Amino acid sequence: MSTSDWSSINGASVPKEDPSTEPFAITAPPKTDIWRRSETDDVFNAPTVFQELPASQFKSIAVTVYAPWHTQYDQGGLVIAFPSSATPSPERETKKAENESPENPVRPSKWIKAGIEFFELSAVLGIVGTDRFSDWSLAPMSQEFHQKARFKIERKEKTLWIYAAQDGVEKMKPMREIKWAFMEGRDEEKLWVGVYAAKPTPEDGEDDEKGLEVTFSDLVIEKEE
């Protein structure tokens, strides 16, 4: 898997080394998120590194996520998204300057994210499925291993299963089943498969422009031949 297979949006940079063999990091500036509260509150401005492929070829993606989470809604993890016809192409977004302030140029029609999120003073395992609007599920993390976890999104026929394992736990556990992912002809559509980092809440005081650096390792993507 070469770096030429990858694209980036919202200020992220494609890693210089192969992401499947070398750890890499994404830094999210404040006021970035992936979240759709309503038709008029639709945000997809989080820095993201991904591959675009036919949805019919997707089998699974897995990655290990780490960061010093400490501000409300700090987050990072896996994301898969169906870009809408109005979504800018990844080629055009990749060429944007790295220091450009993320506005909100990208609005995929449907998406799923799974990762660690900091919520009410604790890191949690968070999963969001967005068909029409976003819904959010949480699971607690142990205080001993609260900064690092591994996630996997796997396709089983028309359904997606999401698995997670905290650092220090060998076996991944099923966290959520999403039935709608590949229904309604979405097998014929393009799919973005990758990782993201987001920091919806700025730091307090003089650090209000400080970003969140999320490190990803052991990234694996499986595709149908």
Please state what every model-predicted region is:
Residues 1-225:
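Extracellular glycan-recognition regions
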